[in-house]
Amino acid sequence: MSSSRKDHLGASSSEPLPVIIVGNGPSGICLSYLLSGYTPYTKPDAIHPHPLLQRKLTEAPGVSILDQDLDYLSEGLEGRSQSPVALLFDALLRPDTDFGGNMKSVLTWKHRKEHAIPHVVLGRNLPGGAWHSIEGSMVILSQGQWMGLPDLEVKDWMQKKRRGLRNSRATAGDIAHYYRDYVVKKGLGHNFVSGAVVTAVEWGTPDPSSCGAQDSSPLFQVSGFLTRNQAQQPFSLWARNVVLATGTFDSPARLGIPGEALPFIHHELSALEAATRVGAVTPASDPVLIIGAGLSAADAVLYARHYNIPVIHAFRRAVDDPGLVFNQLPKMLYPEYHKVHQMMREQSILSPSPYEGYRSLPRHQLLCFKEDCQAVFQDLEGVEKVFGVSLVLVLIGSHPDLSFLPGAGADFAVDPDQPLSAKRNPIDVDPFTYQSTRQEGLYAMGPLAGDNFVRFVQGGALAVASSLLRKETRKPP
């Protein structure tokens, strides 16, 4: 972090910024890249395999994608995202990836410094966000090429680091390092402030003496504290626009049952890693109980199996439920996850086990935990079952922490009467600008707006950058 940004954050009064980005994960990094003047154009000789998109691209030669009509360009595109702009940017960056191809991007990038918009990116961690909190050796779900940001492919970065991609997939540590390196290589570091915790984002008309504003237009006030040398330094900044890019890993989901606060109950895989390192959990221990039927739970099963730690794996759904994520993953790309799914299907707690040390407990409801390290379940027939365990991992998802917003952000959700949820009730945004439908100047991107894969969050950055550039162009001098 540059000293200028530290000074800027430490000041309680300054000229309002055009943009503050809250969150420094892939979404925030990509948006910072676009706001720093890096501008995408179609290569003059590029031919896109999608005929309709190719025709539209030839209609405006020499015009940047940011300056074109994103609604028009994205019309007719289909893919694995509900966001039309996400599909558009993905199609431009990776034209035939869904068909197994490796065609190069049809985009070329120019650095137009005169179009840069001053901004600051606030994050608790180093650039890369929650990727720095994931166990580094864990192989990531997505193919490595889908984790990359504009104009620096993960594959090329890995080769320069004298490393190769295993099965086209990288580790979480690789990706965290890549994102941090991306900020450095693209010269974005002066925009980023790590160790910044945002505690409030409020909208109102400031006292001109407090923010140096030239007029009395309403602004966002972003308050919080900067952690430095084990001390907390408060800050308060004003901005015309705020972009929420915090992701959803802030607050692990909880079961809400008696005993969940007991010390042997955990909600992160790192607890099992720590217990294994210090010998608190061994192959001779009582089983580790893993709750959940998603990829985080599968990662925990794989980790425990690697260290020969006995596992009871419990989940509410049936193993053949089409909604299970395992039923949506290609077996060739994700053999280890399909192995877990096979174990879940075959290893009922009531049947003999060809997989020593693993038992599944499908379609069971967890009732409570007891202080003597026992977990009480109920099956479909209402029969209670009690198991002794050494440690419990509750891995059933996570929720965004938007406690810094009024009403924890629920007022901005698609259904304001329900809790905010990245999968079921995201922030309601315009699909072509990602601006909140309920608050001018407030944007949301990434999982908060319903884009849950790095591959598609970049489309949100494109939409936000295009909208902000239009605003700044219209703003009177």
Swiss-Prot record:
EC top class, as a word: oxidoreductase
Domain of life: Eukaryota
UniProt keyword Flavoprotein present: yes
Entry annotated with the keyword NADP: yes
Tissue: Ubiquitous. Highest expression in the ovary, testis, kidney, skeletal muscle and liver.
EC number: 1.14.13.-
Needed cofactors: NADPH
Gene3D superfamilies: FAD/NAD(P)-binding domain
GO terms for biological process, alphabetical: cell differentiation; negative regulation of cell growth
Induction annotation: By pregnancy.
Additional comment: Loss of OSGIN1 protein disturbs the balance between cell growth, differentiation, and cell death in normal tissue, resulting in uncontrolled growth and formation of tumors.
Cofactor mode of binding and number, as noted: No monooxygenase catalytic activity in the absence of NADPH.
Location in the cell: Midbody
Sequence similarity: Belongs to the OKL38 family.
Organism per entry: Homo sapiens (Human)
Keywords: Developmental protein, Differentiation, FAD, Flavoprotein, Growth regulation, Monooxygenase, NADP, Oxidoreductase, Phosphoprotein
Phosphoserine sites (modified residues): S12
Role according to the record: Monooxygenase catalytic activity. Involved in regulation of cytokinesis; promotes RHOA activity, probably acting locally at the midbody in late cytokinesis. Monooxygenase activity is involved in stabilizing transient structures between daughter cells, termed intercellular bridges, before abscission. Regulates differentiation and proliferation through the regulation of cell death.
SUPFAM superfamilies tied to this protein: FAD/NAD(P)-binding domain (SSF51905)
InterPro entries: FAD/NAD-bd_sf (IPR036188), OKL38_fam (IPR029731)
Official protein name in the record: Oxidative stress-induced growth inhibitor 1
